[in-house]
Amino acid sequence: MAEHNKFKDVCISAVLAAIYVLILVASTDLGSALIFFMIYLFMLFVSTRNIIYLFLGAGGLSGASVIAYHLFSHVQERFIAWRDPWSVIDNAGYQVAQSLFAMGTGLYEGSPKYIPVVTEDFIFSAIAEEFGGLFAMLLILVCFSCFIAFLKIAMEQANMFNKLVCVGLGVGYAVQVFLTIGGALKMIPSTGVTLPLVSSGGSSILSTLFVFAIMQGLAIVGTKVKRNVTRRIPTEGLVNEQRQTERIRQLERTGEIGKVGKKKKKKIK
């Protein structure tokens, strides 16, 4: 019965998540749809600890990608621009080609101003061009460190709801970073997603600040829980030691310990 109810809850949550994702797909915001789908998938895995859901999600994502390719013309354009930007450099591939030119030149020699929407979804190309590849790699390490910190905070949570919130926010942040940097490096098709706390945009920066604020609050909660646990363990040990010491003293007062010692000596003789 418990397994049946658990599977029923998974189905209900899957339907609600699918409705939300389909609304984003209908508004042609496929980048956000992918982010929220990955958030739901990993939260489902953490809550159920069933790896089958990850494989089912990967299969569903592959099927949805094929369907989106045939339904939306802009998805086809971005796929062609990702596969061979030089063949469509005058149209859909212009942004990707200019991004590669900027990063390939580097250190003030490129021209990031020629990249369309360079301050948003292709901000990583401008950073790599202006500050060099080393600075770009350091930026990636900073983003990766933030994700690891999110996972560490999630592991410190005793409450499952708090843990799921940490996992969801951490996965959303990581996927957003991967989509932005991966699109600029031509690893994946461009999705139009901004780089958290780096790209321009008031709503993007504000939402990311809310994410970090929530994570900071959950980190404080996790630290308090950890301190309470570490304090409780030695206290229990001290109480047991005190009780044993008091019991020994009582036996010494009544002479029980001495009698036991004398009996043992007689047996030895």
What are these regions (language model features)?
Residues I181-I188, V193-K269:
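A juxtamembrane structural motif centered on a specific transmembrane helix
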Residues I39-Y53, I115-F135, G192-L206:
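Interfacial segments of multi-pass membrane proteins
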Residues N5-A26, L30-H70:
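Hydrophobic alpha-helical segments of polytopic membrane proteins
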Residues M1-H4, L41-N50, A68, L141-Q157, ...:
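Structural signal for the C-terminal ends of transmembrane alpha-helices
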Residues L24, S65, Y69, V142, ...:
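Alpha-helical transmembrane segments of multi-pass membrane proteins
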Residues Y53-L139, A158-V165:
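Hydrophobic, glycine- and aromatic-enriched re-entrant/interface helices and adjoining loop segments
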Residues Y20-S27, T105-G110, A128-E129, L179, ...:
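Transmembrane alpha-helix interface/packing and boundary motifs in multi-pass membrane proteins
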Residues E156-G192, V198:
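Loop-to-helix entry and N-terminal half of a specific, functionally important transmembrane alpha helix
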